[in-house]
Amino acid sequence: MAKIMIQGTASSVGKSLIVAALCRIFKQDGYSVCPFKSQNMSLNSYITLDGKEMGRAQVLQAYAAGLEPEVYMNPILLKPTSDKKCQIIVNGKVYGNSTAMGYHNLKLKFKNMLKGHFNKLEEDFDIVVMEGAGSPAEINLRDRDIVNMGMAELVDAPVLLVGDIDKGGVFASLAGTMLLLNEGEKKRVKGTIINKFRGDVEILKPGLDMLEDIIHIPCLGVVPYTRLQLEDEDGAVEFNKKAYAPIDIAVIKMPHISNFTDLDALKSEEDVSIRFITSKEEFKEPDLLVIPGSKNTIEDLLYLRKCGLEESIKEYSKDGKIIGICGGYQVLGSKIKDPHNVETDLGEIDGLNLLDMETTFEKEKVTTRVSAKLLNEETKNTVYGYEIHMGISKYGENIKPLFKIYDKNGEKVDYFDGAINEKGNVMGTYIHGVFDGVVFREKIINELRVKKGLKKKKSQMYEHMREKELDKLADIVRHSLDMEKIYSIIGMK
Protein backbone atom coordinates (compact mmCIF):
# COMPACT_ATOMS: atom_id res chain seq x y z
CA MET A 1 0.00 0.00 0.00
CA ALA A 2 1.14 3.55 -0.77
CA LYS A 3 0.71 6.51 1.56
CA ILE A 4 1.27 10.25 1.54
CA MET A 5 0.76 12.79 4.31
CA ILE A 6 -0.27 16.41 3.79
CA GLN A 7 0.95 18.72 6.53
CA GLY A 8 0.76 22.51 6.68
CA THR A 9 2.65 25.48 8.04
CA ALA A 10 -0.44 26.50 10.04
CA SER A 11 -4.15 25.90 10.43
CA SER A 12 -6.40 26.90 7.52
CA VAL A 13 -3.69 26.70 4.85
CA GLY A 14 -5.85 24.30 2.83
CA LYS A 15 -4.66 20.87 3.93
CA SER A 16 -8.14 19.37 4.01
CA LEU A 17 -9.02 20.36 0.44
CA ILE A 18 -5.61 19.27 -0.88
CA VAL A 19 -6.28 15.86 0.70
CA ALA A 20 -9.78 15.80 -0.82
CA ALA A 21 -8.34 16.70 -4.22
CA LEU A 22 -5.71 13.95 -4.07
CA CYS A 23 -8.34 11.42 -2.99
CA ARG A 24 -10.47 12.32 -6.02
CA ILE A 25 -7.45 12.31 -8.38
CA PHE A 26 -6.27 8.88 -7.23
CA LYS A 27 -9.85 7.58 -7.51
CA GLN A 28 -10.13 8.98 -11.04
CA ASP A 29 -6.87 7.22 -11.88
CA GLY A 30 -8.33 3.87 -10.89
CA TYR A 31 -6.93 3.37 -7.39
CA SER A 32 -8.81 2.54 -4.21
CA VAL A 33 -8.02 5.40 -1.84
CA CYS A 34 -8.93 6.37 1.71
CA PRO A 35 -8.42 9.57 3.77
CA PHE A 36 -7.03 9.40 7.31
CA LYS A 37 -6.60 12.03 10.02
CA SER A 38 -5.62 10.57 13.37
CA GLN A 39 -6.84 13.55 15.39
CA ASN A 40 -9.11 16.40 14.37
CA MET A 41 -10.24 19.41 16.37
CA SER A 42 -13.52 20.80 15.12
CA LEU A 43 -17.04 21.68 16.16
CA ASN A 44 -18.30 20.46 12.80
CA SER A 45 -19.07 16.78 13.13
CA TYR A 46 -21.05 14.07 11.36
CA ILE A 47 -22.81 10.86 12.33
CA THR A 48 -21.96 7.71 10.37
CA LEU A 49 -24.45 5.05 9.32
CA ASP A 50 -23.73 3.12 12.52
CA GLY A 51 -24.33 6.15 14.76
CA LYS A 52 -20.73 7.21 15.41
CA GLU A 53 -19.31 10.74 15.40
CA MET A 54 -16.44 12.01 13.25
CA GLY A 55 -15.06 15.25 11.79
CA ARG A 56 -16.72 16.78 8.72
CA ALA A 57 -13.44 17.32 6.84
CA GLN A 58 -12.89 13.57 6.59
CA VAL A 59 -16.50 13.16 5.48
CA LEU A 60 -15.85 15.39 2.47
CA GLN A 61 -12.60 13.52 1.80
CA ALA A 62 -14.44 10.20 1.98
CA TYR A 63 -16.92 11.42 -0.63
CA ALA A 64 -13.98 12.52 -2.77
CA ALA A 65 -12.62 8.98 -2.52
CA GLY A 66 -16.03 7.50 -3.37
CA LEU A 67 -16.47 6.03 0.11
CA GLU A 68 -19.11 6.08 2.83
CA PRO A 69 -17.63 7.99 5.81
CA GLU A 70 -16.39 5.73 8.64
CA VAL A 71 -14.85 6.64 12.00
CA TYR A 72 -11.56 4.86 11.23
CA MET A 73 -10.87 7.78 8.87
CA ASN A 74 -10.85 10.09 11.94
CA PRO A 75 -10.42 8.01 15.12
CA ILE A 76 -9.99 10.98 17.50
CA LEU A 77 -12.18 14.09 17.40
CA LEU A 78 -11.71 16.96 19.84
CA LYS A 79 -14.70 19.30 20.30
CA PRO A 80 -13.83 22.45 22.29
CA THR A 81 -16.35 23.34 24.99
CA SER A 82 -14.41 26.39 26.22
CA ASP A 83 -11.00 28.00 25.73
CA LYS A 84 -9.35 25.41 27.96
CA LYS A 85 -11.57 22.32 27.78
CA CYS A 86 -12.82 19.93 25.14
CA GLN A 87 -14.88 16.80 24.69
CA ILE A 88 -12.84 13.84 23.45
CA ILE A 89 -14.48 11.53 20.91
CA VAL A 90 -12.61 8.24 20.34
CA ASN A 91 -13.75 5.82 17.65
CA GLY A 92 -16.98 7.74 17.31
CA LYS A 93 -18.05 7.72 20.97
CA VAL A 94 -17.55 10.11 23.88
CA TYR A 95 -14.38 9.21 25.78
CA GLY A 96 -14.67 12.05 28.25
CA ASN A 97 -14.01 15.74 28.85
CA SER A 98 -10.55 17.10 29.48
CA THR A 99 -8.37 20.15 29.78
CA ALA A 100 -5.67 20.73 27.16
CA MET A 101 -3.00 19.46 29.56
CA GLY A 102 -5.10 16.47 30.52
CA TYR A 103 -5.47 15.43 26.89
CA HIS A 104 -1.78 16.08 26.23
CA ASN A 105 -0.99 13.53 28.92
CA LEU A 106 -3.45 11.05 27.39
CA LYS A 107 -2.26 11.14 23.77
CA LEU A 108 0.38 8.41 23.85
CA LYS A 109 -2.29 6.04 25.19
CA PHE A 110 -3.97 6.17 21.77
CA LYS A 111 -0.91 5.33 19.64
CA ASN A 112 -1.55 1.59 19.40
CA MET A 113 -5.18 2.19 18.48
CA LEU A 114 -4.16 4.60 15.70
CA LYS A 115 -1.57 2.18 14.37
CA GLY A 116 -4.17 -0.59 14.35
CA HIS A 117 -6.58 1.50 12.29
CA PHE A 118 -3.84 2.37 9.83
CA ASN A 119 -2.72 -1.25 9.49
CA LYS A 120 -6.28 -2.15 8.50
CA LEU A 121 -6.25 0.58 5.85
CA GLU A 122 -3.02 -0.86 4.46
CA GLU A 123 -4.85 -4.13 3.86
CA ASP A 124 -7.95 -2.58 2.29
CA PHE A 125 -6.73 0.26 0.04
CA ASP A 126 -4.13 1.00 -2.63
CA ILE A 127 -3.39 4.49 -1.30
CA VAL A 128 -4.02 6.29 2.00
CA VAL A 129 -3.91 10.10 1.98
CA MET A 130 -3.19 11.37 5.48
CA GLU A 131 -3.76 14.83 6.90
CA GLY A 132 -1.88 16.55 9.69
CA ALA A 133 -3.27 19.20 12.04
CA GLY A 134 -2.11 22.76 12.50
CA SER A 135 1.67 22.80 12.07
CA PRO A 136 4.34 20.09 12.54
CA ALA A 137 6.63 22.77 14.02
CA GLU A 138 4.86 22.96 17.39
CA ILE A 139 8.10 22.01 19.13
CA ASN A 140 6.50 22.09 22.59
CA LEU A 141 4.22 19.20 21.55
CA ARG A 142 6.80 17.09 19.70
CA ASP A 143 7.34 14.43 22.38
CA ARG A 144 3.65 13.42 22.34
CA ASP A 145 2.71 14.17 18.75
CA ILE A 146 0.20 11.74 17.25
CA VAL A 147 -1.12 13.83 14.37
CA ASN A 148 1.81 15.36 12.44
CA MET A 149 5.38 14.04 12.28
CA GLY A 150 4.67 11.64 15.14
CA MET A 151 1.98 9.96 13.03
CA ALA A 152 4.12 10.08 9.88
CA GLU A 153 6.91 8.34 11.76
CA LEU A 154 4.54 5.77 13.25
CA VAL A 155 3.51 4.55 9.78
CA ASP A 156 6.63 5.66 7.84
CA ALA A 157 4.81 8.10 5.54
CA PRO A 158 6.39 10.71 3.24
CA VAL A 159 5.18 14.28 3.78
CA LEU A 160 4.20 17.19 1.53
CA LEU A 161 4.21 20.59 3.27
CA VAL A 162 1.53 23.14 2.31
CA GLY A 163 1.91 26.90 2.71
CA ASP A 164 -0.81 29.54 2.22
CA ILE A 165 0.47 32.44 0.11
CA ASP A 166 -2.83 34.33 0.44
CA LYS A 167 -2.00 35.07 4.09
CA GLY A 168 1.39 36.51 3.14
CA GLY A 169 4.81 35.33 4.29
CA VAL A 170 4.60 31.92 2.64
CA PHE A 171 8.36 31.61 2.06
CA ALA A 172 9.12 32.47 5.68
CA SER A 173 6.47 30.05 6.95
CA LEU A 174 7.79 27.17 4.84
CA ALA A 175 11.45 27.89 5.63
CA GLY A 176 10.68 28.52 9.30
CA THR A 177 8.75 25.27 9.60
CA MET A 178 11.64 23.32 8.07
CA LEU A 179 14.09 25.08 10.41
CA LEU A 180 12.20 23.84 13.47
CA LEU A 181 11.98 20.21 12.35
CA ASN A 182 14.63 17.76 13.52
CA GLU A 183 16.81 15.96 10.97
CA GLY A 184 14.63 12.85 10.82
CA GLU A 185 11.51 14.94 10.27
CA LYS A 186 13.17 17.04 7.57
CA LYS A 187 14.00 13.88 5.61
CA ARG A 188 10.31 12.96 5.52
CA VAL A 189 9.36 16.17 3.69
CA LYS A 190 9.57 15.35 -0.01
CA GLY A 191 8.04 18.52 -1.43
CA THR A 192 6.21 21.77 -0.77
CA ILE A 193 2.94 23.10 -2.16
CA ILE A 194 2.09 26.79 -2.46
CA ASN A 195 -1.66 27.14 -1.99
CA LYS A 196 -4.20 29.93 -2.70
CA PHE A 197 -2.07 31.90 -5.18
CA ARG A 198 -3.53 34.90 -7.02
CA GLY A 199 -1.75 36.31 -10.04
CA ASP A 200 0.94 35.30 -12.53
CA VAL A 201 2.98 32.26 -11.47
CA GLU A 202 5.95 33.54 -13.51
CA ILE A 203 6.41 36.35 -10.98
CA LEU A 204 6.59 33.74 -8.21
CA LYS A 205 9.17 31.45 -9.82
CA PRO A 206 12.34 33.29 -8.69
CA GLY A 207 11.11 33.01 -5.10
CA LEU A 208 10.44 29.29 -5.53
CA ASP A 209 13.98 28.77 -6.80
CA MET A 210 15.45 30.68 -3.85
CA LEU A 211 13.27 28.74 -1.39
CA GLU A 212 14.48 25.45 -2.85
CA ASP A 213 18.09 26.61 -2.45
CA ILE A 214 17.40 27.39 1.22
CA ILE A 215 15.45 24.28 2.30
CA HIS A 216 16.70 21.84 -0.38
CA ILE A 217 13.20 20.54 -1.07
CA PRO A 218 11.40 20.98 -4.41
CA CYS A 219 8.14 22.87 -4.81
CA LEU A 220 5.69 20.44 -6.43
CA GLY A 221 3.28 23.10 -7.59
CA VAL A 222 1.33 26.29 -7.06
CA VAL A 223 -2.43 25.90 -6.56
CA PRO A 224 -4.49 28.97 -7.52
CA TYR A 225 -6.92 30.66 -5.17
CA THR A 226 -10.32 29.26 -6.14
CA ARG A 227 -13.80 29.78 -4.73
CA LEU A 228 -15.61 26.45 -4.60
CA GLN A 229 -18.94 25.47 -3.05
CA LEU A 230 -17.27 23.03 -0.66
CA GLU A 231 -17.54 23.12 3.12
CA ASP A 232 -14.89 24.72 5.32
CA GLU A 233 -14.34 23.07 8.70
CA ASP A 234 -11.87 25.44 10.33
CA GLY A 235 -14.14 28.34 11.16
CA ALA A 236 -17.34 30.13 10.43
CA VAL A 237 -15.82 32.34 7.77
CA GLU A 238 -17.77 34.97 5.91
CA PHE A 239 -19.70 33.56 2.99
CA ASN A 240 -18.93 34.68 -0.54
CA LYS A 241 -20.84 37.80 -1.44
CA LYS A 242 -23.07 37.34 -4.49
CA ALA A 243 -23.51 40.10 -7.06
CA TYR A 244 -27.30 39.82 -6.91
CA ALA A 245 -29.07 37.59 -4.44
CA PRO A 246 -32.56 38.78 -3.48
CA ILE A 247 -32.97 36.28 -0.62
CA ASP A 248 -31.10 37.48 2.48
CA ILE A 249 -30.43 34.83 5.16
CA ALA A 250 -28.85 35.98 8.42
CA VAL A 251 -27.11 33.50 10.73
CA ILE A 252 -26.36 34.20 14.39
CA LYS A 253 -22.61 33.67 14.84
CA MET A 254 -22.46 32.56 18.46
CA PRO A 255 -19.13 32.06 20.30
CA HIS A 256 -19.59 28.27 20.42
CA ILE A 257 -21.19 27.87 16.98
CA SER A 258 -21.01 24.29 15.70
CA ASN A 259 -22.03 22.36 12.61
CA PHE A 260 -22.33 25.51 10.53
CA THR A 261 -21.81 23.16 7.58
CA ASP A 262 -25.62 22.85 7.83
CA LEU A 263 -25.66 26.11 5.86
CA ASP A 264 -23.64 24.87 2.87
CA ALA A 265 -26.67 23.59 0.98
CA LEU A 266 -28.45 26.92 1.47
CA LYS A 267 -25.57 28.89 -0.03
CA SER A 268 -25.72 26.62 -3.11
CA GLU A 269 -28.99 28.35 -4.07
CA GLU A 270 -28.14 30.98 -6.70
CA ASP A 271 -30.52 33.63 -5.41
CA VAL A 272 -29.60 33.21 -1.73
CA SER A 273 -27.00 35.24 0.15
CA ILE A 274 -25.90 34.24 3.66
CA ARG A 275 -24.31 36.56 6.20
CA PHE A 276 -23.22 36.14 9.80
CA ILE A 277 -24.35 38.58 12.46
CA THR A 278 -22.74 39.16 15.86
CA SER A 279 -24.54 42.31 17.01
CA LYS A 280 -27.97 43.91 16.89
CA GLU A 281 -26.53 46.59 14.58
CA GLU A 282 -25.85 43.91 11.96
CA PHE A 283 -29.32 42.36 12.24
CA LYS A 284 -31.18 44.55 9.70
CA GLU A 285 -34.19 42.90 7.98
CA PRO A 286 -33.31 39.38 6.76
CA ASP A 287 -35.77 37.17 4.92
CA LEU A 288 -34.79 34.27 7.18
CA LEU A 289 -32.92 34.05 10.48
CA VAL A 290 -31.05 30.84 11.28
CA ILE A 291 -29.81 30.06 14.78
CA PRO A 292 -27.30 27.22 14.27
CA GLY A 293 -25.92 24.52 16.54
CA SER A 294 -23.81 25.23 19.61
CA LYS A 295 -21.32 23.25 21.69
CA ASN A 296 -22.36 25.27 24.74
CA THR A 297 -25.98 26.28 24.36
CA ILE A 298 -26.34 27.96 27.74
CA GLU A 299 -23.23 30.12 27.34
CA ASP A 300 -24.39 31.13 23.86
CA LEU A 301 -27.86 31.98 25.16
CA LEU A 302 -26.23 34.22 27.77
CA TYR A 303 -24.22 35.80 24.94
CA LEU A 304 -27.42 36.58 22.99
CA ARG A 305 -28.77 38.23 26.12
CA LYS A 306 -25.62 40.24 26.85
CA CYS A 307 -25.05 41.61 23.33
CA GLY A 308 -28.67 42.61 22.77
CA LEU A 309 -29.43 40.04 20.07
CA GLU A 310 -32.13 38.42 22.23
CA GLU A 311 -34.21 41.58 21.96
CA SER A 312 -33.62 41.76 18.18
CA ILE A 313 -34.61 38.11 17.71
CA LYS A 314 -37.82 38.52 19.70
CA GLU A 315 -38.81 41.65 17.80
CA TYR A 316 -38.05 39.94 14.47
CA SER A 317 -40.14 36.89 15.47
CA LYS A 318 -43.35 38.94 15.23
CA ASP A 319 -43.30 38.74 11.42
CA GLY A 320 -39.99 37.19 10.35
CA LYS A 321 -39.17 33.52 9.77
CA ILE A 322 -36.78 31.82 12.22
CA ILE A 323 -35.25 28.34 12.08
CA GLY A 324 -33.19 26.92 14.95
CA ILE A 325 -31.04 23.82 14.52
CA CYS A 326 -30.00 21.67 17.50
CA GLY A 327 -28.63 24.17 20.06
CA GLY A 328 -30.37 26.91 18.11
CA TYR A 329 -33.62 24.97 18.48
CA GLN A 330 -33.07 24.61 22.23
CA VAL A 331 -32.61 28.35 22.81
CA LEU A 332 -35.97 29.03 21.11
CA GLY A 333 -37.78 27.19 23.91
CA SER A 334 -39.08 28.49 27.22
CA LYS A 335 -36.45 26.92 29.46
CA ILE A 336 -33.20 24.91 29.44
CA LYS A 337 -32.50 22.69 32.46
CA ASP A 338 -29.04 21.31 33.26
CA PRO A 339 -29.44 19.13 36.39
CA HIS A 340 -26.18 17.25 35.79
CA ASN A 341 -24.08 20.37 35.08
CA VAL A 342 -23.37 19.15 31.56
CA GLU A 343 -22.60 22.70 30.38
CA THR A 344 -22.66 24.97 33.42
CA ASP A 345 -23.55 24.97 37.11
CA LEU A 346 -26.51 27.33 36.63
CA GLY A 347 -29.08 24.54 36.98
CA GLU A 348 -31.56 26.10 34.58
CA ILE A 349 -32.02 29.19 32.45
CA ASP A 350 -34.93 30.83 30.64
CA GLY A 351 -34.89 30.47 26.87
CA LEU A 352 -36.10 32.96 24.26
CA ASN A 353 -39.64 31.63 24.83
CA LEU A 354 -40.52 31.64 21.13
CA LEU A 355 -41.48 27.94 21.14
CA ASP A 356 -43.57 26.27 23.84
CA MET A 357 -41.11 23.57 24.84
CA GLU A 358 -38.48 22.85 27.49
CA THR A 359 -35.10 21.14 27.14
CA THR A 360 -33.33 19.07 29.79
CA PHE A 361 -29.67 18.12 29.35
CA GLU A 362 -28.96 14.44 29.99
CA LYS A 363 -25.64 12.74 30.77
CA GLU A 364 -25.61 10.64 27.59
CA LYS A 365 -25.10 12.17 24.16
CA VAL A 366 -27.52 11.29 21.35
CA THR A 367 -25.65 10.43 18.12
CA THR A 368 -27.88 8.92 15.46
CA ARG A 369 -28.73 8.97 11.77
CA VAL A 370 -32.41 9.63 11.10
CA SER A 371 -34.98 9.60 8.33
CA ALA A 372 -38.05 11.78 8.85
CA LYS A 373 -41.28 12.91 7.25
CA LEU A 374 -42.05 16.62 7.12
CA LEU A 375 -45.42 17.10 8.82
CA ASN A 376 -46.97 19.43 6.27
CA GLU A 377 -50.23 19.41 4.34
CA GLU A 378 -48.48 19.79 0.99
CA THR A 379 -45.69 17.24 1.21
CA LYS A 380 -44.86 14.01 3.01
CA ASN A 381 -41.44 13.56 1.42
CA THR A 382 -38.47 12.25 3.36
CA VAL A 383 -35.78 14.33 5.05
CA TYR A 384 -32.47 12.66 5.93
CA GLY A 385 -29.95 13.85 8.50
CA TYR A 386 -28.36 13.15 11.85
CA GLU A 387 -28.66 14.16 15.49
CA ILE A 388 -25.85 15.15 17.89
CA HIS A 389 -27.12 16.53 21.20
CA MET A 390 -27.25 16.10 24.98
CA GLY A 391 -30.73 17.58 25.45
CA ILE A 392 -34.21 16.10 25.40
CA SER A 393 -36.99 18.56 24.52
CA LYS A 394 -40.60 18.22 25.67
CA TYR A 395 -43.55 19.97 24.05
CA GLY A 396 -45.99 22.30 25.73
CA GLU A 397 -49.62 22.70 24.69
CA ASN A 398 -49.30 25.52 22.15
CA ILE A 399 -46.96 23.88 19.69
CA LYS A 400 -46.84 21.37 16.84
CA PRO A 401 -44.04 18.96 15.91
CA LEU A 402 -42.15 19.65 12.68
CA PHE A 403 -41.05 16.14 11.69
CA LYS A 404 -41.92 12.52 12.40
CA ILE A 405 -38.82 10.30 12.70
CA TYR A 406 -39.43 6.84 11.24
CA ASP A 407 -35.89 5.45 10.96
CA LYS A 408 -33.05 5.69 13.47
CA ASN A 409 -29.71 4.08 12.59
CA GLY A 410 -31.54 1.63 10.32
CA GLU A 411 -34.19 0.67 12.89
CA LYS A 412 -37.88 1.48 12.51
CA VAL A 413 -39.07 4.04 15.07
CA ASP A 414 -41.99 6.41 15.49
CA TYR A 415 -41.50 9.70 17.32
CA PHE A 416 -41.69 13.44 16.70
CA ASP A 417 -38.82 15.87 16.22
CA GLY A 418 -38.66 19.62 16.17
CA ALA A 419 -41.41 22.14 16.69
CA ILE A 420 -43.24 24.95 14.92
CA ASN A 421 -45.35 27.68 16.50
CA GLU A 422 -49.03 28.24 15.72
CA LYS A 423 -48.27 31.11 13.36
CA GLY A 424 -45.84 28.91 11.42
CA ASN A 425 -42.96 31.38 11.30
CA VAL A 426 -40.74 30.07 14.14
CA MET A 427 -39.50 26.50 14.04
CA GLY A 428 -36.64 24.29 15.13
CA THR A 429 -35.24 20.78 14.76
CA TYR A 430 -32.49 18.53 16.09
CA ILE A 431 -31.75 17.27 12.56
CA HIS A 432 -28.38 18.36 11.20
CA GLY A 433 -28.16 18.27 7.40
CA VAL A 434 -31.84 19.16 7.18
CA PHE A 435 -31.17 21.45 4.20
CA ASP A 436 -28.95 18.97 2.32
CA GLY A 437 -31.90 17.23 0.70
CA VAL A 438 -34.27 19.04 -1.63
CA VAL A 439 -37.52 18.69 0.36
CA PHE A 440 -37.13 21.06 3.31
CA ARG A 441 -34.72 23.48 1.61
CA GLU A 442 -36.94 23.94 -1.44
CA LYS A 443 -40.04 24.43 0.73
CA ILE A 444 -38.42 27.09 2.93
CA ILE A 445 -36.67 29.03 0.15
CA ASN A 446 -39.77 29.00 -2.06
CA GLU A 447 -41.82 30.43 0.81
CA LEU A 448 -39.29 33.26 1.01
CA ARG A 449 -39.40 33.76 -2.77
CA VAL A 450 -43.19 33.97 -2.84
CA LYS A 451 -43.21 36.46 0.04
CA LYS A 452 -40.87 38.70 -2.00
CA GLY A 453 -42.92 38.35 -5.18
CA LEU A 454 -40.41 36.02 -6.84
CA LYS A 455 -41.15 32.83 -8.75
CA LYS A 456 -40.75 29.44 -7.13
CA LYS A 457 -37.73 27.38 -8.23
CA LYS A 458 -36.68 23.75 -8.13
CA SER A 459 -33.68 23.08 -5.90
CA GLN A 460 -30.88 20.79 -7.00
CA MET A 461 -29.61 17.85 -4.97
CA TYR A 462 -26.73 19.12 -2.86
CA GLU A 463 -24.70 15.92 -3.28
CA HIS A 464 -24.84 16.29 -7.08
CA MET A 465 -23.44 19.80 -6.81
CA ARG A 466 -20.81 18.61 -4.34
CA GLU A 467 -19.64 15.90 -6.75
CA LYS A 468 -19.23 18.48 -9.52
CA GLU A 469 -17.28 20.75 -7.20
CA LEU A 470 -15.00 17.89 -6.12
CA ASP A 471 -14.29 17.09 -9.77
CA LYS A 472 -13.54 20.76 -10.37
CA LEU A 473 -11.19 20.81 -7.35
CA ALA A 474 -9.40 17.69 -8.56
CA ASP A 475 -8.97 19.17 -12.03
CA ILE A 476 -7.44 22.37 -10.63
CA VAL A 477 -5.04 20.51 -8.33
CA ARG A 478 -4.09 17.91 -10.97
CA HIS A 479 -3.06 20.68 -13.37
CA SER A 480 -1.26 22.63 -10.63
CA LEU A 481 0.86 19.89 -9.06
CA ASP A 482 3.54 17.61 -10.46
CA MET A 483 1.44 14.46 -10.16
CA GLU A 484 4.12 12.34 -11.82
CA LYS A 485 6.52 13.34 -9.03
CA ILE A 486 3.88 12.65 -6.36
CA TYR A 487 3.25 9.17 -7.78
CA SER A 488 7.01 8.60 -7.69
CA ILE A 489 7.19 9.72 -4.04
CA ILE A 490 4.54 7.19 -3.00
CA GLY A 491 6.10 4.44 -5.11
CA MET A 492 3.33 4.21 -7.70
CA LYS A 493 3.90 4.33 -11.48
From Swiss-Prot:
The keyword Metal-binding does not apply. GO terms for biological process: cobalamin biosynthetic process. Keywords: Cobalamin biosynthesis, Glutamine amidotransferase. One of its GO terms (molecular function) is catalytic activity. Pfam families: CbiA (PF01656), GATase_3 (PF07685). The active site is at 326 (nucleophile), 432. Residues 246-440 form the GATase cobBQ-type domain. Gene3D superfamilies: 3.40.50.880, P-loop containing nucleotide triphosphate hydrolases. Signal peptide: none annotated. The keyword rRNA-binding does not apply. Pathway: Cofactor biosynthesis; adenosylcobalamin biosynthesis. NCBIfam families: cobQ, PRK00784.1. Catalyzes amidations at positions B, D, E, and G on adenosylcobyrinic A,C-diamide. NH(2) groups are provided by glutamine, and one molecule of ATP is hydrogenolyzed for each amidation. Belongs to the CobB/CobQ family. CobQ subfamily. This is Cobyric acid synthase. The gene is cobQ.
